[in-house]
Design a protein with these regions (language model features):
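Redox- and metal-dependent alpha/beta enzyme cores, enriched for Fe-S-associated oxidoreductases
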Residues: 81-110, 284-348
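Acidic/His-rich segments in extracytoplasmic proteins that coordinate ligands and/or metal ions
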Residues: 126-195
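A charged, amphipathic alpha-helical module
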Residues: 2-69, 186, 190, 194-318
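Structural motif
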Residues: 73-76, 145-149, 282-287, 364-366
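An N-terminal, globular interaction/scaffold subdomain
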Residues: 52-53, 57-60, 70-119, 129-133
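A short, acidic, amphipathic alpha-helical segment used as a generic capping/interface helix at domain edges
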Residues: 131-132, 339-355, 373-377
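Conserved small/polar residues in nucleotide/adenosyl-binding loops
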Residues: 384-389
């Protein structure tokens, strides 16, 4: 017998031909969950993880409720500029995961495929395309994306911009991690600022941008301390919390909420006891919606999810509020997902040594060609690099 979530998902699917009704149903469900997270948070979660669930839910509701202030972006788009303009980012991975949590993703994926989108496209992007092409997401102000980390970005966001008749901004990031690439991306980010001024009919508040970059700098510094503090500790973690943290480490960078989460997380980790079972690093997105993954990893003393590499992609990045464009550009250029897979492999090895990792799960999510293409290289480097990890598994 279907449970209440499955019934809700079916209601949303049935309402897709009436996109405004589908949007309002999703908002109703998301807001109900938001109230639950505030009044009755999951007791097993630490304070930081409870807070992450709340702010991630708020960040999902806001652009859906106010599409006229929303920007459809990819996960790696620097959003400090959006925060300076008081705009609301919506990104593919979050959209797809929350639809899945509401048991409503199938209808939107089917809608996208019926509109001519390839079945082999990234499932995250198909969900966003389904919401956009059906009209359920509402009409955003514009779309913007980077070339990091996959070729689906240009297709997805350009197609949605054409569908809505709205502007599109594409930020091509050079593969080389050097000062010339940083200078080039800095110039493009200044062009993006001008693009935002045209889209919003407002001038950039440079003080607001500097404040956002300062928030990012403090957030990243706290998160780096938190990653280092994980060594040898029993973290009592769950897979969904790692997904929520993706908001903080990407589209929410530059907000006081992200900084507050990082501060809470560091305190939680430092208060955690030493010891624990098998310590795992997860590479790529965590499929928290799959019951077998939750059963084996959530709050487990035997198998602990220590880190997801998506939440450690910019460790060590210094943000200078007096040089906001250069700082955002350097963070983007030096991201481990930019360029060769060796950058990502080296970060995984750093985390394994830092956090005393026993094994790595490399998740080949359907449609992510970059991740699947690097799987064997990743595995061989991990297996033959001493002293850890001791094991590596593909899924």
């Amino acid at each position: 017998m279907p449970n209440i979530v499955d019934r809700f998902g079916q209601l949303v699917d049935d309402a897709i031909p009436k996109p405004e009704l589908a949007r309002q149903l999703l908002l109703l469900g998301y807001r109900a969950k938001d109230v639950q997270l505030l009044l009755a948070p999951e007791k097993e979660l630490t304070p930081a993880r409870q807070y992450a669930a709340q702010i991630a839910m708020d960040a999902m509701i806001a652009p859906l409720a106010h599409p006229q202030r929303a920007a459809l972006v990819n996960i790696f788009m620097p959003c400090e500029l959006l925060h300076a303009f008081h705009l609301l980012p919506m990104f593919a991975e979050a959209t797809a995961c929350y639809l899945n949590g509401a048991a409503a993703e199938r209808g939107f994926i089917h809608y996208a495929e019926s509109a001519g989108i390839s079945p082999t496209l990234c499932s995250y992007h198909k969900a966003l395309l389904g919401m956009g092409l059906s009209g359920t997401a509402g009409k955003p102000l514009f779309t913007a994306c980077t070339s990091i980390a996959c070729d689906a970005n240009n297709l997805t966001f350009r197609r949605l911009a054409q569908h809505y008749g709205i502007p599109h901004f594409y930020l091509d990031v050079p593969y080389d991690h050097d000062e010339y690439a940083v200078a080039e991306v800095s110039d493009r980010l200044r062009e993006f600022a001008a693009f935002l001024e045209d889209a919003t009919h407002q001038k950039l508040d440079e003080a607001a941008l500097q404040q956002a970059v300062a928030h990012s700098g403090r957030t990243l510094e706290l998160l780096q301390q938190a990653q280092a503090a994980k060594a040898g500790r029993n973290l009592h973690n769950d897979v969904t919390s790692e997904f929520y943290e993706v908001f903080v480490t990407h589209t929410m960078l530059g907000t006081p909420q992200a900084e507050q989460y990082a501060r809470k997380l560091l305190a939680d980790i430092e208060a955690s006891p030493m010891g624990g079972g098998t310590r795992l690093l997860w590479a790529h997105a965590v499929p928290f919606y799959q019951a077998p993954v939750r059963e084996r990893l959530n709050f487990s003393a035997e198998n602990q999810l220590i880190t997801c590499d998506m939440n450690a992609d910019t460790l060590g990045c210094y943000m200078d509020p007096d040089k906001p464009f250069e700082s955002m550009a350097a963070r983007l250029v030096n991201n481990i997902f930019n360029g060769s897979a060796q950058h990502r492999i080296q970060r995984a090895l750093e985390l394994c040594r830092m956090q005393q990792i026993d094994g790595v799960v490399y998740f080949c999510q359907w449609g992510c060609k970059q991740t699947m293409g690097a799987a064997q290289l990743f595995k061989s480097c991990l297996l033959y690099t001493s002293p850890s990890p001791r094991d590596a598994h593909e899924s």
